[in-house]
Regions:
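Membrane-integral, polyisoprenol-dependent glycosyltransferases
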Residues: 1-180
Length: 180
Protein backbone atom coordinates (compact mmCIF):
# COMPACT_ATOMS: atom_id res chain seq x y z
CA UNK A 1 0.00 0.00 0.00
CA UNK A 2 1.45 3.35 -1.02
CA UNK A 3 1.31 6.13 1.45
CA UNK A 4 -0.16 9.43 0.26
CA UNK A 5 1.38 12.62 1.71
CA UNK A 6 -0.92 14.53 4.05
CA UNK A 7 -1.20 17.57 1.78
CA UNK A 8 -2.23 15.41 -1.18
CA UNK A 9 -4.88 13.53 0.79
CA UNK A 10 -7.71 15.86 -0.23
CA UNK A 11 -10.25 14.58 2.26
CA UNK A 12 -8.28 16.35 5.01
CA UNK A 13 -8.32 19.76 3.36
CA UNK A 14 -11.77 20.86 4.55
CA UNK A 15 -11.37 19.60 8.15
CA UNK A 16 -7.97 21.30 8.37
CA UNK A 17 -9.43 24.54 7.04
CA UNK A 18 -12.34 24.29 9.50
CA UNK A 19 -9.91 23.83 12.39
CA UNK A 20 -7.93 26.89 11.32
CA UNK A 21 -11.20 28.83 10.87
CA UNK A 22 -12.23 28.04 14.44
CA UNK A 23 -8.85 29.06 15.82
CA UNK A 24 -8.58 32.19 13.69
CA UNK A 25 -12.08 33.63 13.81
CA UNK A 26 -14.19 32.14 16.60
CA UNK A 27 -12.23 30.95 19.65
CA UNK A 28 -12.00 33.53 22.46
CA UNK A 29 -13.71 36.11 20.29
CA UNK A 30 -14.77 38.34 23.16
CA UNK A 31 -11.21 38.99 24.34
CA UNK A 32 -10.56 41.86 21.94
CA UNK A 33 -11.77 45.27 23.08
CA UNK A 34 -14.24 46.99 20.76
CA UNK A 35 -12.59 49.64 18.63
CA UNK A 36 -14.19 52.87 17.41
CA UNK A 37 -15.20 51.54 13.99
CA UNK A 38 -16.82 48.45 15.45
CA UNK A 39 -18.73 50.58 17.94
CA UNK A 40 -19.96 52.95 15.24
CA UNK A 41 -21.20 50.11 13.09
CA UNK A 42 -23.08 48.45 15.93
CA UNK A 43 -24.61 51.75 17.08
CA UNK A 44 -25.85 52.31 13.53
CA UNK A 45 -27.40 48.83 13.45
CA UNK A 46 -28.93 49.32 16.90
CA UNK A 47 -30.52 52.62 15.85
CA UNK A 48 -31.86 50.93 12.74
CA UNK A 49 -33.64 48.37 14.90
CA UNK A 50 -34.91 50.69 17.63
CA UNK A 51 -36.06 53.45 15.25
CA UNK A 52 -37.71 50.88 12.93
CA UNK A 53 -36.04 52.56 9.97
CA UNK A 54 -34.25 49.92 7.90
CA UNK A 55 -33.68 52.10 4.84
CA UNK A 56 -31.89 55.15 6.22
CA UNK A 57 -28.96 54.30 8.50
CA UNK A 58 -28.25 56.88 11.19
CA UNK A 59 -25.80 57.25 14.04
CA UNK A 60 -26.88 59.51 16.88
CA UNK A 61 -29.66 60.81 14.64
CA UNK A 62 -27.28 61.87 11.85
CA UNK A 63 -27.20 60.17 8.45
CA UNK A 64 -24.43 57.58 8.15
CA UNK A 65 -23.91 56.69 4.53
CA UNK A 66 -20.17 55.93 4.60
CA UNK A 67 -20.66 52.18 4.77
CA UNK A 68 -22.69 49.80 2.59
CA UNK A 69 -26.14 48.84 3.89
CA UNK A 70 -25.94 45.02 3.75
CA UNK A 71 -23.52 44.55 6.68
CA UNK A 72 -25.58 47.05 8.67
CA UNK A 73 -28.71 45.03 7.95
CA UNK A 74 -26.92 41.81 8.98
CA UNK A 75 -25.85 43.46 12.24
CA UNK A 76 -29.40 44.76 12.74
CA UNK A 77 -30.85 41.27 12.31
CA UNK A 78 -28.35 39.98 14.88
CA UNK A 79 -29.40 42.85 17.14
CA UNK A 80 -33.04 41.75 16.83
CA UNK A 81 -32.14 38.12 17.58
CA UNK A 82 -29.78 38.85 20.47
CA UNK A 83 -29.51 42.49 21.62
CA UNK A 84 -26.11 43.79 22.74
CA UNK A 85 -24.32 40.55 21.91
CA UNK A 86 -20.88 41.56 20.63
CA UNK A 87 -19.52 37.99 20.28
CA UNK A 88 -22.46 37.09 18.01
CA UNK A 89 -21.86 40.23 15.93
CA UNK A 90 -18.23 39.18 15.61
CA UNK A 91 -19.24 35.63 14.72
CA UNK A 92 -21.13 36.99 11.71
CA UNK A 93 -17.95 38.69 10.53
CA UNK A 94 -16.16 35.39 11.16
CA UNK A 95 -18.65 33.61 8.90
CA UNK A 96 -17.94 36.18 6.20
CA UNK A 97 -14.21 35.48 6.63
CA UNK A 98 -14.91 31.76 6.28
CA UNK A 99 -16.83 32.49 3.08
CA UNK A 100 -13.89 34.56 1.78
CA UNK A 101 -11.36 31.79 2.40
CA UNK A 102 -13.61 29.06 0.95
CA UNK A 103 -14.20 31.06 -2.22
CA UNK A 104 -10.45 31.66 -2.40
CA UNK A 105 -9.79 27.92 -2.01
CA UNK A 106 -12.23 27.11 -4.81
CA UNK A 107 -10.79 29.86 -7.01
CA UNK A 108 -7.20 28.71 -6.46
CA UNK A 109 -8.24 25.12 -7.22
CA UNK A 110 -9.90 26.13 -10.49
CA UNK A 111 -7.11 28.51 -11.46
CA UNK A 112 -4.18 26.14 -10.92
CA UNK A 113 -5.76 22.69 -10.86
CA UNK A 114 -3.58 21.95 -7.82
CA UNK A 115 -5.52 21.40 -4.60
CA UNK A 116 -2.37 21.36 -2.48
CA UNK A 117 -1.51 24.83 -3.76
CA UNK A 118 -5.09 25.93 -3.00
CA UNK A 119 -4.82 24.58 0.55
CA UNK A 120 -1.50 26.25 1.29
CA UNK A 121 -2.67 29.54 -0.25
CA UNK A 122 -5.92 29.43 1.72
CA UNK A 123 -4.09 28.69 4.96
CA UNK A 124 -1.78 31.64 4.33
CA UNK A 125 -4.78 33.87 3.62
CA UNK A 126 -6.67 32.59 6.66
CA UNK A 127 -3.75 33.22 8.98
CA UNK A 128 -2.75 36.64 7.67
CA UNK A 129 -3.06 39.40 10.22
CA UNK A 130 -5.49 41.61 8.32
CA UNK A 131 -7.94 38.78 7.57
CA UNK A 132 -7.82 37.56 11.18
CA UNK A 133 -8.43 41.08 12.47
CA UNK A 134 -11.35 41.69 10.10
CA UNK A 135 -12.81 38.25 10.80
CA UNK A 136 -12.65 38.73 14.57
CA UNK A 137 -14.16 42.22 14.77
CA UNK A 138 -17.60 43.37 13.73
CA UNK A 139 -16.43 45.69 10.96
CA UNK A 140 -17.90 45.86 7.50
CA UNK A 141 -14.81 45.41 5.31
CA UNK A 142 -14.75 41.61 5.55
CA UNK A 143 -18.21 41.40 3.99
CA UNK A 144 -17.07 43.44 0.98
CA UNK A 145 -13.99 41.27 0.52
CA UNK A 146 -15.92 38.01 0.89
CA UNK A 147 -18.65 38.92 -1.58
CA UNK A 148 -16.13 40.29 -4.08
CA UNK A 149 -14.12 37.05 -3.87
CA UNK A 150 -17.35 35.20 -4.69
CA UNK A 151 -17.90 37.53 -7.64
CA UNK A 152 -14.35 36.95 -8.90
CA UNK A 153 -14.79 33.19 -8.58
CA UNK A 154 -18.05 33.11 -10.54
CA UNK A 155 -16.76 35.57 -13.13
CA UNK A 156 -13.71 33.37 -13.65
CA UNK A 157 -15.94 30.31 -14.08
CA UNK A 158 -18.06 32.22 -16.58
CA UNK A 159 -15.14 33.42 -18.66
CA UNK A 160 -13.60 29.94 -18.80
CA UNK A 161 -16.76 28.44 -20.35
CA UNK A 162 -17.00 28.03 -24.10
CA UNK A 163 -20.73 28.72 -24.10
CA UNK A 164 -22.49 31.54 -22.28
CA UNK A 165 -23.64 30.34 -18.86
CA UNK A 166 -26.12 32.95 -17.65
CA UNK A 167 -26.53 31.52 -14.13
CA UNK A 168 -22.79 32.02 -13.53
CA UNK A 169 -22.96 35.58 -14.87
CA UNK A 170 -25.94 36.27 -12.63
CA UNK A 171 -24.16 34.78 -9.60
CA UNK A 172 -21.12 36.97 -10.33
CA UNK A 173 -23.34 40.03 -10.62
CA UNK A 174 -25.24 39.24 -7.43
CA UNK A 175 -22.05 38.76 -5.41
CA UNK A 176 -20.56 41.92 -6.89
CA UNK A 177 -23.71 43.83 -6.00
CA UNK A 178 -23.67 42.47 -2.46
CA UNK A 179 -20.11 43.70 -2.00
CA UNK A 180 -21.07 47.37 -2.46
Amino acid sequence: MTRVPFTQNYRWHLPLLLLVFCCSFFINNGAIFADIMESRNIVTAREMVYDHNWLVPTMNGELRLEKPPLPTWIAAVVEVISPDNLPLQRAMAGLAAVMLVLFFYKFATKLTGNRTYALVSSLILCTSYNIILMGRTATWDIYCHAFMMGAIYYLYLTLRQTACKWPLFIAAGVFMGLSF
